[in-house]
Swiss-Prot record:
It is an enzyme of class 1 (oxidoreductase). One of its GO terms (cellular component) is mitochondrion. It comes from Nicotiana tabacum (Common tobacco). Belongs to the protoporphyrinogen/coproporphyrinogen oxidase family. Protoporphyrinogen oxidase subfamily. GO terms for biological process: protoporphyrinogen IX biosynthetic process. GO terms for molecular function: oxidoreductase activity; oxygen-dependent protoporphyrinogen oxidase activity. FAD binds at residues 20-25, 43-44, 51, 65-68, 264, 473-475. Residues 213-232 are annotated as: Disordered. This is Protoporphyrinogen oxidase, mitochondrial.
Length: 504
């Protein structure tokens, strides 16, 4: 029997392999599929979602990876709307109430620059330096501004002083990527601000001019409603946790399209006589199959961490393609510790998002990077009689501490929460997950990593790289990276299809 028109169209569609089922890979697969391409996602682990992991247990709901995201990327809006997740979007209560530990005590962080200047959070000298920054740095010569290897701490200290670095920048980078301002490259960690200095000298003046420029208004599109503006500014999660996002994409993929426990062993790029483009052959292995399996594809999106990519065998037109040009990537280790305390045992419960701990606060006995007030943000995450906290330990600040045992981590977290929130006694519940490679560290020599990714893409036709090794570490950036790679694949396949028709 001849296949139906729909079946024939499906079988004749180009095939694309996506390696890795984290948020980047799943976003790429979703966009490719709605474009009509055949997609196969290979995931070495037994579950999809990457570092978006939500757990529901004994009336508690917590995230072991990212806890929130923002809608600053257009691709995030596209996916949420396409997947019908608006009704499941969950915004934290009092998310503008964020605290910074200072002298061993949590201090409410002013929610905007004007309130910061009016408050006592910073010294008079630091506030004066902030006020004078637009004047002192206006039209500075290029020789006096940041070079591509300058650290985050060096950049912000030049503009705003050491106190701002110690009590604003340091806790911020620790809380967002587990890094520290001395190890991070300004060029790669905050490219927008780095470019503003190049253009305007003053970061504050540049930010104001950039926001008010007609080009920026045009880029932002038509006027947004207040609800849309709130969505784009604020952090959010989903009912059930962040994994709700990746689960929704997985539901759209058939079992043969999402291959869990399927490890890619070899990739081979070759050009056949009857094809005008390079095709890809992928050999993968699964525990439930005795023999490895070989399949052909028209393009590949690679989202695996570079440390895993280096272990793959890749051939190009019959010859080994060595990946020895990929440098060693420095990764940040992190432990995520979940605790609950009876409400009556927390003497100073703070309403808000959470508290961050600057490095300097270690002199006051604080060892954690920060704590999210999970059940304060999302009351449905815990029963009414307990508080649920998510605490982060380790990072580049203290790599060894990230690897500590659960018993030691419990003592560290309990001690910090006692000092910061007045939590007394033992927690009623403790859990933790150790991420040995939580984030790639955008360090001073990260150019070599980006150059290696570019070289890999340039020398392997039809292969595109996506993920948080390039373009940003946030969930939104990683998701957008996957969507962008999908767009590049679509353009690539359309261009080679046009070229092949010209040769007919």
């Amino acid at each position: 029997m001849a296949p139906s028109a729909g079946e024939d169209k499906h079988s004749s569609a180009k095939r694309v392999a996506v390696i890795g089922a984290g948020v980047s890979g799943l976003a790429a697969a979703y966009k490719l599929k709605i474009h009509g391409l055949n997609v196969t996602v290979f995931e070495a682990e037994g579950k999809a979602g990457g570092k978006l992991r939500s757990v529901s247990q004994d009336g508690l709901i917590w995230d072991e990876g990212a806890n929130t995201m923002t809608e600053s990327e257009g691709d995030v809006t596209f996916l949420i709307d396409s997947l019908g997740l608006r009704e499941k979007q969950q915004f934290p209560l009092s998310q503008n109430k964020r605290y910074i530990a200072r002298n061993g005590t949590p201090v409410l962080l002013p929610s905007n620059p004007i309130d910061l200047i009016k408050s006592n959070f910073l010294s008079t000298g630091s506030k004066l330096q902030m006020l004078l920054e637009p004047i002192l740095w206006k039209n500075k010569k290029l020789s006096q501004v940041s070079d591509s290897h300058e650290s985050v701490s060096g950049f912000f200290q030049r503009h705003f002083g050491k106190e701002v670095v110690d009590y604003l920048i340091d806790p911020f980078v620790a809380g967002t990527c587990g890094g520290d301002p001395d190890s991070l490259s300004m060029h790669h960690s905050f490219p927008e601000l780095w470019n503003l200095e190049k253009r305007f000298g003053s970061v504050i003046l540049g930010a104001i001019r950039s926001k008010l420029s007609p080009k920026n208004e045009k880029k932002q599109g038509p006027p947004k409603t207040s609800a849309n503006k709130k969505r784009q500014r604020g952090s959010f999660s989903f009912l059930g946790g962040m994994q709700t996002l990746t689960d929704a994409i997985c539901k759209d993929l058939r079992e043969d399209e999402l291959r869990l426990n399927s490890r890619v062993l070899e990739l081979s790029c070759s050009c056949t006589e009857d094809s005008a483009i390079d095709s890809w052959s992928i050999i993968s292995a699964s525990p439930h199959k005795r023999q490895s399996e070989e399949e052909s594809f028209d393009a590949v999106i690679m989202t695996a961490p570079l440390c895993d990519v280096k272990s793959m065998k890749i051939a190009k037109r019959g010859n080994p393609f060595l990946l020895n040009f990929i440098p060693e990537v420095d990764y940040v280790p992190l432990s995520v510790v979940i605790t609950t305390f009876k409400r009556e045992n927390v003497k100073y419960p703070l309403e808000g998002f959470g508290v961050l701990v600057p490095s300097k606060e270690q002199q006051h006995g604080l060892k954690t990077l920060g704590t999210l007030f999970s059940s304060m943000m999302f009351p449905d995450r815990a029963p009414n009689n307990v508080y649920l906290y998510t605490t982060f330990v380790g990072g580049s600040r203290n790599r060894e501490l990230a690897k500590a045992s659960r018993t030691e981590l419990k003592e560290i977290v309990t001690s910090d929460l006692k000092q910061l929130l007045g939590a007394e006694g033992e927690p009623t519940y403790v859990n933790h997950l150790y991420w040995s490679k939580a984030f790639p560290l955008y360090g001073h020599n990260y150019d070599s990593v980006l150059d290696a990714i570019d070289k890999m893409e340039k020398n392997l036709p039809g292969l595109f790289y996506a993920g948080n090794h390039r373009g940003g570490l946030s969930v939104g950036k990683a998701l957008s990276s996957g969507c962008n790679a999908a767009d590049l694949v679509i353009s690539y396949l359309e261009s080679v299809s046009t070229d092949s028709k010209r040769h007919c």
